[in-house]
């Protein structure tokens, strides 16, 4: 690089070496190698991007079995997997082998969907779409199944195993199906453990006439009606013929757990009020149920005037019984008075207006009398006799001074009166002496 000559302190070769793994020297990844080999048109880049993140479905697989014909998976798969009459649907494979391989690959997802709704129904397609969106698409599963079937078929041809006997129509005979059913009956799982509710409205399940018959596809309404009509009924097993597989101890325990769960879910219907009234009537005799306690009635009654939600928490004290009774009676009287006031709001308003009017009149009279008394006091004071604008404080002060002066003059006059009386007494006594002499 030419920059290495001008900048000696900076070694750009080392920098290039550090970032060299991020550059590709005329080497481009061939994303379309598989498509070119298969002579297909290369897809859009968006599809390749999604293909990089594509995940194959990996649900938990059930244990491998000899044949899947005796399990409900065959019944469900037969309803949406048609078979041709000319090639038997699988070339050198029997229908039982094909079903076993498909069931092991798919993990029973499509089989479980067939129990819920009809495969031809639109809801079944929607359910498949929803389920496959969770597992990254249905196309990957279909492609994987086709590749696995091709590999199994090639391995079967290489091994040179003879093909099973076929009937006149190109399909395996019914005796082979029945033989496979009876041979693998002990290895199958009881369908009642997986699906406890019966598929039809009748009390007993109808056995299929032949393995080629379509599966039962009950609607949701029939399932709900059967579940509601018999919530405590024992689950009915599903099968292709009259023989039911033997149940082990684990199966019986699982059935008991299912029954217990159904009992928990079931809602106990209470006795209607009419029947309760009949049972509580005197005609029922000694067997009649006692009526509800008053505590229940008290709880049902919700007073709206006894609790204030905006108030702080109350700090009530435990009073004696007598005091509590008095308080309760006082509360009742207060409630009655409040109710009376609330009953006639117009009368209370008129009473308040009348009372206010009378109070105003009395207050006016009191003020007028006080004013007249002040005027009279002012007239008695010589200094303020002609002063009409004299304030009340001046009137009171002058009146006090005038009263004190009047009291002092009174005492002086009383003392003079006493002196004059004594003088009179002396003069009278002297006059008497002059008369007698």
Curated annotation (Swiss-Prot):
It comes from Feline leukemia virus FTT. Residues 201-358 are annotated as: Disordered. GO terms for cellular component: host cell nucleus. One of its GO terms (molecular function) is protein-containing complex binding. Its main location: host cell. Residues 266-278, 315-331 have a biased composition (Basic and acidic residues). One of its GO terms (biological process) is regulation of telomere maintenance. This protein is synthesized as a Gag-vMyc chimeric protein. The sequence shown here corresponds to the Myc homolog fragment of the chimera. Residues 251-263 have a biased composition (Acidic residues). This is Viral myc transforming protein. The lineage of its organism: Viruses, Riboviria, Pararnavirae, Artverviricota, Revtraviricetes. CDD domains: bHLHzip_c-Myc. Residues 354-406 form the bHLH domain. Residues 335-347 have a biased composition (Polar residues). The keyword Transcription regulation applies. It is found in: Host nucleus. Participates in the regulation of gene transcription. Binds DNA in a non-specific manner, yet also specifically recognizes the core sequence CAC[GA]TG. Seems to activate the transcription of growth-related genes. The keyword Repeat does not apply. Keywords: Activator, DNA-binding, Host nucleus, Oncogene, Transcription, Transcription regulation. Residues 413-434 are annotated as: Leucine-zipper. The gene is MYC. Pfam families: HLH (PF00010), Myc-LZ (PF02344), Myc_N (PF01056). Residues 207-235 have a biased composition (Low complexity).
